[in-house]
Structures are given as C-alpha cells and as structure tokens.
C-alpha cells in the first residue's frame, strides 16, 4: 500500500521536487487520517480505508495523493480522470466523496470524466490505478513513447502507448479507469 506515495515520488523526482518515498506516503496518510478518517469516520472512504489495510498500511486515495502533491512546489496542475467503468466498479461508493474532496476549497483541483484517455493524452505524467488497488507512474516521453514505473518491484518498462507500456510491465495489470494526470 505504499505504492501511491512511491509512484508520486517518482514523478516528483523527475520534476526535481522529489524526496524520500516514505515521506511522500506519510503525507498522503496524514491527509487521509486528518481529513477523512478523523473528520468523517462513517464515510464510505473511511470504511474502505480501514477495511482494506494491507500489512497495517492504508491505500492511497486520489484525494490523499492530490493533497501530498500540493505540498510540493511545482508549476503543475492536477486533473483526476475516471472512466465510466471505474465509476460503476467496486470503488463506486467513493467517487462522489472523492470528487467533493478533490474539487473542494482545500485541494481545488479538477476532475474529468472521460472514456478516451488514450487518444487524448496531453499530460506528461499519469498515476494509473491498476487492479483497483495498485498505483503505478507513467511518463509520456513523446508521441509514441511511454515509460512506466512500478513501485512494487522498482521496475520500469516502455511502450508505444500507455496501455502497451503497462502490459510490458506486468501482463496481469488491468487498468482500473482512474488516473491522476499531472
């Protein structure tokens, strides 16, 4: 469950703002504990986070990743994108809560519902949720080249599309339809 922090740190390092990956993860968790679990213990997000701990760690939700990103000085804006499959998937109860947090006054970031991310990629970095529980980092190098970083094993791979780069990383990865675009 450290993957959200480690994937975000990979992007921050590439942007020249990186730090220790565990520090980034801890910023995500600090936000989630204070802004989600303590303030709204009965929310879908709190119930999900506490019910899906892995080795004592909480998953990184998009709002937590956005909050941590905002703590670092960059000139980038963040757009969280999701497709209709994700909206109706196993995390559907979290979507409306996450949208409120991400677009609210504290974070003030954008949300975009779209089903055609592959053909419209204009972002340089994308954190991609795979298998509904694991974050990987993707860098859009140029028109026909994407590089993925998997924090689980510290491996990377490339491909001519984002999907191909992820497939080259690990064939078992299924893109869930949730993207944090930077």
PLM regions and their residue ranges:
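Short, solvent-exposed mixed-charge patches
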Residues: 181-182
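Active-site nucleophile-adjacent alpha helix/oxyanion-hole segment immediately C-terminal to the catalytic cysteine
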Residues: 1-41
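Conserved active-site-adjacent core of cysteine acyl-enzyme catalytic domains
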Residues: 34-135, 139-176
């Amino acid at each position: 469950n450290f993957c959200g922090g480690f994937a975000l740190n990979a992007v921050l390092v590439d942007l020249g703002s990186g730090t220790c990956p565990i520090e980034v993860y801890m910023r995500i968790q600090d936000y989630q504990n204070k802004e989600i679990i303590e303030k709204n213990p009965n929310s879908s997000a709190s119930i999900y986070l506490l019910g899906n701990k892995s080795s004592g760690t909480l998953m990184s939700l998009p709002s937590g990743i956005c909050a941590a990103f905002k703590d670092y000085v960059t000139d980038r804006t963040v757009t969280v994108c999701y497709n209709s499959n994700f909206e109706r998937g196993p995390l559907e109860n979290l979507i409306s809560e996450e949208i409120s947090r991400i677009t609210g006054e504290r974070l003030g970031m954008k949300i975009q519902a779209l089903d055609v991310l592959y053909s419209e990629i204009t972002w340089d970095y994308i954190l991609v949720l795979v298998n509904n529980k694991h974050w990987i980092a993707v860098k859009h190098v140029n028109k026909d080249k994407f590089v993925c970083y998997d924090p689980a094993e510290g491996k990377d791979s490339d491909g001519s599309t984002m999907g191909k780069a992820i497939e080259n990383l690990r064939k078992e990865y299924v893109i869930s339809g949730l993207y944090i675009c930077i």
